[in-house]
């Protein structure tokens, strides 16, 4: 397998969220996800790089749907890095946090990236994601969704279902606590 001619293979790391890395000397380093290496206090660090398209074309291995869109939230769920952009949930390959392209286009693997839109009759721009009770809750301004799948969450078994339809303030991220999830909403001049 190879990449089709004239097909872009990379995601611009300047448009992707940056990393904050705690170094051995107790300080923090803010850096792009660019694959660079550096040494501090005799400790070497290798910054990860964004994965590249290694096979297929824009149809068989499409660009992740977050490209060119504003990211509303970043999260981890079931060993995947996740992003919310518009109505989409985008998750990396399982265990490979910066890989958003499939390894192969000849078959579907359980580890493949996930890129799925919410299914609702209303426009639901997803604002926040909260891992809760081994599931993932998604919040838009007027609806809440639950991401479900099998014991292993894959691109072929994922589903996003509406659970409730309460207003939620997009400026405040919901918080899970015990068996509850707390989120704010506006009521007049109060939250």
Region locations from a protein language model:
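Beta-propeller and closely related beta-pinwheel folds
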Residues: 46-79, 84-191
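Long, charge-dense tracts
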Residues: 1-67
């Amino acid at each position: 397998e190879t990449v089709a001619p004239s097909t872009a293979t990379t995601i611009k790391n300047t448009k992707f969220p940056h990393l904050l890395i705690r170094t051995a000397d107790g300080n923090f380093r803010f850096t792009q996800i660019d694959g660079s290496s550096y040494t501090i206090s005799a400790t070497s660090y290798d910054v990860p790089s964004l994965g590249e398209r290694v096979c297929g074309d824009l149809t068989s291995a499409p660009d992740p749907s977050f490209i060119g869109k504003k990211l509303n939230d970043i999260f981890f769920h079931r060993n995947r890095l996740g992003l919310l952009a518009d109505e989409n949930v985008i998750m990396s390959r399982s265990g490979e946090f910066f890989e958003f392209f499939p390894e192969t286009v000849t078959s579907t693997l359980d580890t493949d990236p996930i890129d799925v839109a919410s299914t609702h009759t209303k426009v639901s721009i997803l604002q926040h994601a909260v891992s809760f009770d081994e599931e993932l809750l998604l919040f838009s301004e007027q609806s809440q969704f639950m991401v479900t799948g099998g014991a292993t969450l894959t691109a072929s078994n994922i589903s996003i279902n509406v659970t409730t339809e309460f207003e939620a303030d997009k400026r405040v991220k919901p918080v899970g606590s015990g068996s509850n999830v707390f989120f704010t909403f506006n009521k007049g001049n109060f939250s």
